[in-house]
Structure formats: structure tokens, C-alpha cells
């Protein structure tokens, strides 16, 4: 099994739900990315999603767009992100790392070269926002051949056919976007999430992580009641945007630890 599959199997055996935080590589400081990844793990992350900055992040709201712009201005590239993962792996061989980004940087490198470089760096999964599942069979096969789980997005508007298409190519987990629109939006409706997950589970035999609109421990706990994992990104990127540089890692770890406690509370039956 892959590192991601092992992680979710262990969570299921413990009756726990996963916590998947997202940060943008290189923001606020390229020299601090590995330190921040360790802070996420120390706070209780089960999987880390590491954003690869891109100049036109169409699925992202203003908070993550700004973080991408800052990282690009500081020279962050797909190659430097892979270097960050390699340096993270020198100390942490347990926590899965998923790269989340857009097709253009991968296509410039070439899928085969990317798969080899990502494998060698210690990447466990890749989520390419603008790769539709129906057109991703070759890419997904190349990733799996390198031991990397191809992860795909589903949304409230996803049809049964689209869900089935994801089921044919995805591994590791699927990321259910709980809101229409862009990352960081508000107005989370947990009951609508709960209503959609059975349709996903019937066609995709993978854990379902839910993200978009999760901003605090209370919403994380509510989502953890109905999902296999909680994905949180914009709130963490905003925290890093506002934190004093010398306090960023500690504040990040502390906030993730609060989410961890809340999610673990959701996973346990009431006494």
C-alpha cells in the first residue's frame, strides 16, 4: 500500500478521521516551507497538501491567489517545491505529502520526468486541478507506476458519470469541494455534504476528504462527522499571511492542533 493508503487504513482502524492541511510552497518565505511542513505534522496533520504556485490559479480564492503570487515573486518553481519535499523527507518518512496545483508546470517538465522526480523526492500524491478525470487515464497510470496516488476533485455539481470517471482513475483519496466557487468561500452546509457522500462512495471506493469553507475547529468537527477527512487551506494561508515571521510555525502548529482535537472529538461516539 502507498503511504496515503496506509495512513487512511490506520485512521479507519482507530475510528478516527483524517486532517489534511494545505499551505502554498514558498509562502511566506521559501526558506521556511520545510519548517512549516514539520509544524503541520507536529500539530497533527495526517496528510500534507503542498500547493505548487501558479500564475493563474483559477480554482483558488483571493487568499491562495495572493500566496501563489508571493511565492512566484520569490522564485518558487515546481523544481524547488520537489526540493522542499526531499528536505522534509530527511526528517519525516511517515507523513504523506500531496502536491496540489495546475497542469502547466507539470506539462512543461513532462509527465514521465515529473513522475520520476516526484517519486525520488518522496511525493505521495498529486492533485492537478485542471485535469478532468475523463482525459487523465495516461497521466494517472504514469503516477501510479511511480507509486504516486492521482487524486481528483469532485463538487456538488458533479454528475454520477463524472463521479464514476473519477472512480476509474483516482487512488489514495478523493477531494470533495463542499461549495460551488473558489477556495476560501463561506456558508458551509454540512447536511448537503452528508447527502452527497453516499453517491460518491457508491462509485469511488476511496476515502473522501472534504474541503472549501472550513475555517475553524467547529466547522472542522462538523465536517468530520460526515467525511473521512477534513481539508483546510485558505484559513492556514491567511494565518501565515498575518503572522509575525518568527511566530509563524508555532502559530500554525497550534491552530492545526486545535483542529486535531476537534476532529478526534467528532470521530468518537458520544459517551
UniProtKB/Swiss-Prot annotation:
Keywords: Amino-acid biosynthesis, Aromatic amino acid biosynthesis, Lyase, Tryptophan biosynthesis. GO terms for molecular function: tryptophan synthase activity. Pathway: Amino-acid biosynthesis; L-tryptophan biosynthesis; L-tryptophan from chorismate: step 5/5. One of its GO terms (cellular component) is cytosol. Its EC number is 4.2.1.20. It comes from the Bacteria. It catalyses: (1S,2R)-1-C-(indol-3-yl)glycerol 3-phosphate + L-serine = D-glyceraldehyde 3-phosphate + L-tryptophan + H2O. It holds the Pfam family Trp_syntA. It is an enzyme of class 4 (lyase). The active site is at residues 49, 60. The alpha subunit is responsible for the aldol cleavage of indoleglycerol phosphate to indole and glyceraldehyde 3-phosphate. PANTHER family: TRYPTOPHAN SYNTHASE ALPHA CHAIN, CHLOROPLASTIC (PTHR43406:SF1), TRYPTOPHAN SYNTHASE, ALPHA CHAIN (PTHR43406). Belongs to the TrpA family. This is Tryptophan synthase alpha chain. It comes from Burkholderia pseudomallei (strain K96243). The gene is trpA.
Amino acid at each position: 500500500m502507498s503511504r496515503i493508503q496506509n495512513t487512511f487504513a490506520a485512521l479507519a482502524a482507530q475510528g478516527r478521521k483524517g486532517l489534511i492541511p494545505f499551505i502554498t510552497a514558498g509562502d511566506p518565505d521559501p526558506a521556511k516551507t520545510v519548517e512549516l511542513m514539520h509544524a503541520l505534522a507536529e500539530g497533527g496533520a495526517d496528510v500534507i497538501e503542498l500547493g505548487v504556485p501558479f500564475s493563474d490559479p483559477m480554482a483558488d480564492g483571493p487568499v491562495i491567489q495572493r500566496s501563489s503570487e508571493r511565492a512566484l515573486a520569490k522564485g518558487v518553481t515546481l523544481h524547488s517545491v520537489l526540493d522542499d519535499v526531499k528536505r522534509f523527507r530527511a526528517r519525516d518518512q511517515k507523513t504523506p505529502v500531496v502536491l496540489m496545483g495546475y497542469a502547466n508546470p507539470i506539462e512543461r517538465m513532462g509527465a514521465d520526468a515529473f513522475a520520476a522526480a516526484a517519486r525520488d523526492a518522496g511525493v505521495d500524491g498529486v492533485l492537478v486541478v485542471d485535469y478532468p478525470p475523463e482525459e487523465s487515464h495516461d497521466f494517472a497510470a504514469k503516477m501510479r507506476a511511480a507509486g504516486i496516488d492521482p487524486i481528483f476533485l469532485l463538487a456538488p455539481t458533479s454528475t454520477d458519470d463524472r463521479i464514476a470517471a473519477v472512480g476509474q482513475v483516482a487512488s489514495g483519496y478523493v477531494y470533495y469541494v463542499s461549495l460551488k466557487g473558489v477556495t476560501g468561500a463561506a456558508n458551509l452546509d454540512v447536511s448537503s455534504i452528508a447527502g452527497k457522500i453516499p453517491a460518491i462512495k457508491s462509485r469511488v471506493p476511496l476515502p473522501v476528504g472534504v474541503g472549501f469553507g472550513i475555517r475553524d475547529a467547529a466547522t472542522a468537527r462538523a465536517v468530520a462527522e460526515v467525511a473521512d477527512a477534513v481539508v483546510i487551506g485558505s484559513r492556514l494561508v491567511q494565518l501565515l499571511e498575518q503572522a509575525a515571521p518568527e511566530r509563524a510555525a508555532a502559530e500554525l502548529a497550534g491552530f492545526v492542533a486545535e483542529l486535531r482535537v476537534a476532529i478526534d472529538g467528532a470521530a468518537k461516539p458520544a459517551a
